[in-house]
Amino acid sequence: MRQSWSVNNLTDFVVDSVKHAHADDAPFYHLRFDRIFPDDFYMEMVQAMPMPEDYRAMSGKSKMGSSRPDGKPTRAKLDLFPEYIRHLPQTKRVVWDVAGRVLRSKEVGSAFVQRLAPGLKRRFGENFSEVGMYPVPILTRDIPGYRIFKHTDSLWKGITVQFYLPPDNSTPHVGTIFHEVLPNGRKPKKTQMPFSPNTGYAFAVADNTWHSADPVGPEVKTRDSILLTYFVDAGPWRFVRNRSRRFLNLLLNEVRNLKRS
């Protein structure tokens, strides 16, 4: 990795990318990114992808959405916190450590809050900027058979961000689909994010942020991305919940690594 890409320099770059991202109101307020990371750092991430055994299978909607006949989980994750990535080889660990620190930074979080103000104001009111947010970046890997049905995201979440990490532009059709809500309650496809290198999207989670993903076909080897979720961190219950989830996930991850050794 280039020495010049310090955490501070990379944070400044990502903040600038967020500030200059394209905004769209349809079907709900969201941002689109065309170059969230510097090109050379993006290639470092692509080349530093963990091995399949470094990931842990995800549950919940991502598991239930599996279209595989055997029901095998089709989404796996690696949390970008130091205690999770410490098992990676040093050359890969340094890349994901920097990425995680940048995405958890206050500067990046503040940039998202500023740019997503219309959506956050709709949900939280005039004082939206005072609502605490707890960032959790995870590296996700989807395999053929993955799909996720129309949903808005849990209101435990304040902001959803996804950065796509494909090595090339050969599978743009597997990006996330955004749905509009018609007066009769139907939710047809309105637009789709292209699954292209160094791109992505962000939105403030609300009752109208319907999105989905079609089944990933056999033409896709892996659908790699970073999911950056800002959990609402207001009040003692949410404060404890957010941090206890990190600790419990750490225990599950350590048990899995002990079984591997």
Q: How should these model regions be labeled?
A:
Residues 76-83, 184-186, 207-211, 246-251:
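A general structural signal for short secondary-structure boundary/capping elements
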Residues 92-228, 232-240:
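Catalytic core of non-heme Fe(II) oxygenases with the double-stranded beta-helix
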Residues 64-72, 139-140, 246-253:
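Amphipathic alpha-helical surface "interface" segments used
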Residues 13-17, 83-84, 125-127:
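Short, flexible segments with low predicted structural confidence
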Residues 17, 21, 44, 48, ...:
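Residues that form generic nucleotide/phosphate-binding pockets
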Residues 20-115:
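Non-heme Fe(II)/2-oxoglutarate
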Residues 48-52, 177-181, 240-250:
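Short intrinsically disordered coil segments
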Residues 1-26, 243-261:
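Fe(II)/2-oxoglutarate
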